[in-house]
Amino acid sequence: MIGAFRIVGYVIASADGRIADASGHPASLKLDADHRFFAAGLNHVDAVVHGRHSHEGEPDSVRRRRLILTRRVASLAPDPENSMARLWNPAGASFEEACAALGLSSGTVAILGGPLVYTLFLKRGYDNFHLSRAVNVRIPDGLPVFIREAYGGEPEAALAASGLTPGPTLWLDDEVSVTDWERAG
C-alpha cells in the first residue's frame, strides 16, 4: 500500500520477459484470453497509471481516471486530451498528490506500464502484481518489464526481490498463463 492506496500491476510478457519489441510495439502480445482477464480486472480499479506510450485501449478507457507519467510537466497538469486524466511528474508531486488531483484519497490503482512505470512502483511497493505470460511468443531485443539496470533478470526475480511471493499459475488458455504475486501480510 502507498498510503491508503492498494497498488496492483498488470502486464503480459513474452516467454523471454519482454513487453514490446524494440520499437515499443506489443502487437504479438495482444492475445484474447489475456485481454479478457485484464479488462475484467480493470473493472474493479479506481484509477490507472501508465506512461505516455502505454494505454489499455478499452472502449470505456476515456471514462477511467488516470495518471500519465511524463517529464514534460513540472509536477501535475490536466491532460489536454482527456478530462479524466492528469499528467504527472513524480519528481515534482507525490503519488498521493497526483491521486488527489483525480479526486481520490484512497482506493485501488492499477499500474499498466511501461518499464519505467513498472520499475517506479516496484520500488514503492506493489500489493499485487498479475504477471501474464505469452508462452509461445519470444521478442529478442524487446523491452523488459522492469528496467534491467535496476532489477536485472527475469520479472519473477525482480518481483521476488521486492518482497512479493507467487501464487499458483492459472492457465487462461493454451497460450497465456497468469501468476498473481502478492505481498505477505
What are these regions (language model features)?
Residues 1-185:
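Enzymes that bind and transform nitrogen-containing heteroaromatic metabolites
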